[in-house]
C-alpha cells in the first residue's frame, strides 16, 4: 500500500512554514491520539501524522522528501516508530503525558502518614500442636522508630528544616521545550528527596533515617485446628508506620511436620490399622490410637482389607470454630511371614473345605492367637 503525501496528511501545501507545520501536527496529534480519539483507525492515523511531522519539521529530511519523495525521506534516516524522540531526552510519551494527565497530575503528599510494611514469619509445628493449638513467643527483626531522635532522624535538640528549593512541597517545576511550546512538569525535589524537609544535623544513632533495626519479641497464639500452609495475621506487629502512619501487620505462616501414624485431610484424620487374617475373618475388638487418646473399635467378622471405619468427633477442630472433624480408620490385613506347623495345617484344612464350620474357625482363631 502506497504512502500518502506528507503535506496531504497534515493538510498543508508544499510551501507551508515551520510554524504552520507545528500547528497542524499539534492539532492532528491531539485529535488522533489513542487515549483521546474513539475513531476505529486512530492509531494508524496518529502514526501517519507523527511520521509526516518527523520529516517535514526537519530541514534536511524535508529537502530530501521534496526532491525524492518517500524514497528520499527514508534514505538513511531509519524508521518512524512510535518511540521516536524529538531530541534532548523528551519524547512523544512525555508530551502526551503532559497533555493527558501524566507529568502534570496531582501527586501524593510526601509527608502524609503511610502504613508500615507487612512482615512474614515461618513457624514449624508438630502434628498434635497444630491440632490443639499453641502459644508461641517469637523474635522478629523489625525497623522501629529510633529511640534517640523519636523517629525524626534529626539530632536531639535540633529539628528538620523546610527545604528552600521546593518550599516544603517536595516538588519542583521543570520547563522543557516541545513542538507544542514550553511545557512545565512537576517532579520530586532532588535536594530533599521529595520530602520537603532537610535534616542538617542527623541523629548519630540512626544516621538520619529515623529507624533502627532490632529484634522484637511477639506473642503469637496458634489456633487449634490450623493446617499446613495456613497463615495467621497479627495486626499491627509489622514495620513501624511512616510520618505517624499505622504499623504494618505480621503474617505467621505455619508448617506442620508429618506424623508416623496419622495423616490429615482438612478437619479429618486418616490412619491405617494393621490386623491379622484371623481378626478380619473372625471379628475382634481392637484399640485404635487417636490424638484424643485410645478408643475401642469393633471389627465385624468377615471385614475386608481396605474397609474404612469412622470415629466421630475424633478428628481436628475446625480452625474457624465450625465443629470437629472425624477420624477414619482403614484396616489392612497383615499376612504372616512365619507360620508354625499347626498354623500351616489349619490353613491347608481351611483352604480345602468348601463349607466352613464353627469348630474350624475356633481352631484358626486360637492358632493365630497362640492359644
Curated annotation (Swiss-Prot):
Family, as annotated: Belongs to the DnaJ family.
Bilayer-crossing regions: none
Compartmental location: Cytoplasm
Functional summary from the UniProt entry: Participates actively in the response to hyperosmotic and heat shock by preventing the aggregation of stress-denatured proteins and by disaggregating proteins, also in an autonomous, DnaK-independent fashion. Unfolded proteins bind initially to DnaJ; upon interaction with the DnaJ-bound protein, DnaK hydrolyzes its bound ATP, resulting in the formation of a stable complex. GrpE releases ADP from DnaK; ATP binding to DnaK triggers the release of the substrate protein, thus completing the reaction cycle.
Chain positions recorded as Zn(2+) 2 binding sites: 163, 166, 189, 192
Mapped zinc finger ranges (CR-type): 133-215
Cofactor(s) recorded in Swiss-Prot or TrEMBL: Zn(2+)
Name of the protein: Chaperone protein DnaJ
One annotated Gene Ontology cellular component of this protein: cytoplasm
This protein's UniProt keywords: Chaperone, Cytoplasm, DNA replication, Metal-binding, Repeat, Stress response, Zinc, Zinc-finger
Domain notes: The J domain is necessary and sufficient to stimulate DnaK ATPase activity. Zinc center 1 plays an important role in the autonomous, DnaK-independent chaperone activity of DnaJ. Zinc center 2 is essential for interaction with DnaK and for DnaJ activity.
Predominant cellular place of this UniProt entry's protein: cytoplasm
Extent of the CXXCXGXG motif repeats: 146-153, 163-170, 189-196, 203-210
Amino acid at each position: 500500500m502506497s504512502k500518502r503525501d506528507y503535506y496531504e496528511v497534515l493538510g498543508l501545501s508544499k510551501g507551508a512554514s515551520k510554524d504552520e507545520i507545528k500547528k497542524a501536527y499539534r492539532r492532528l496529534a491531539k485529535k488522533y491520539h489513542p487515549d483521546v480519539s474513539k475513531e476505529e483507525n486512530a492509531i494508524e492515523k496518529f502514526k501517519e501524522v507523527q511520521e509526516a511531522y518527523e520529516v517535514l519539521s526537519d530541514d534536511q529530511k524535508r529537502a530530501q522528501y521534496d526532491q525524492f519523495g518517500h524514497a528520499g525521506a527514508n534514505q538513511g534516516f531509519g524508521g518512524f516508530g512510535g518511540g521516536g524522540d524529538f531530541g534532548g531526552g523528551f519524547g512523544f510519551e512525555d508530551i502526551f503525558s503532559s497533555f493527558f494527565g501524566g507529568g502534570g497530575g496531582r501527586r501524593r503528599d510526601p509527608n502524609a502518614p503511610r502504613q508500615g510494611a507487612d512482615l512474614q514469619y515461618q513457624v514449624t509445628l508438630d502434628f498434635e500442636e497444630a491440632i490443639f493449638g499453641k502459644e508461641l513467643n517469637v523474635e522478629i527483626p523489625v525497623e522501629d522508630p529510633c529511640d534517640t531522635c523519636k523517629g525524626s532522624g534529626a539530632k536531639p535538640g535540633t529539628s528538620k528544616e523546610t527545604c528552600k528549593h521546593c518550599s516544603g512541597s517536595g516538588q519542583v517545576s521543570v520547563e522543557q521545550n516541545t513542538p507544542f511550546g514550553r511545557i512545565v512538569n512537576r517532579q520530586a525535589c532532588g535536594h530533599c528527596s521529595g520530602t520537603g524537609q532537610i535534616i542538617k544535623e542527623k541523629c548519630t544513632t540512626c544516621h538520619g533515617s529515623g529507624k533502627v533495626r532490632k529484634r522484637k519479641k511477639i506473642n503469637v497464639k496458634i489456633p487449634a485446628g490450623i493446617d499446613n500452609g495456613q497463615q495467621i495475621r497479627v495486626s499491627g506487629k509489622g514495620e513501624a508506620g511512616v510520618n505517624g502512619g499505622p504499623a504494618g501487620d505480621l503474617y505467621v505462616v505455619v508448617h506442620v511436620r508429618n506424623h508416623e501414624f496419622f495423616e490429615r485431610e482438612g478437619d479429618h484424620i486418616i490412619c491405617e490399622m494393621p490386623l491379622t487374617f484371623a481378626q478380619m475373618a473372625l471379628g475382634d475388638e481392637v484399640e485404635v490410637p487417636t490424638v484424643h487418646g485410645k478408643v475401642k473399635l469393633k471389627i465385624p467378622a468377615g471385614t475386608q482389607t481396605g474397609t474404612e471405619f469412622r470415629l466421630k468427633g475424633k478428628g481436628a477442630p475446625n480452625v474457624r470454630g465450625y465443629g470437629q472433624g472425624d477420624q477414619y480408620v482403614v484396616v489392612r490385613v497383615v499376612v504372616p511371614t512365619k507360620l508354625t506347623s499347626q498354623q500351616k495345617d489349619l490353613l491347608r484344612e481351611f483352604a480345602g473345605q468348601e463349607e466352613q464350620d464353627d469348630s474350624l474357625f475356633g481352631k484358626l482363631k486360637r492358632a493365630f492367637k497362640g492359644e
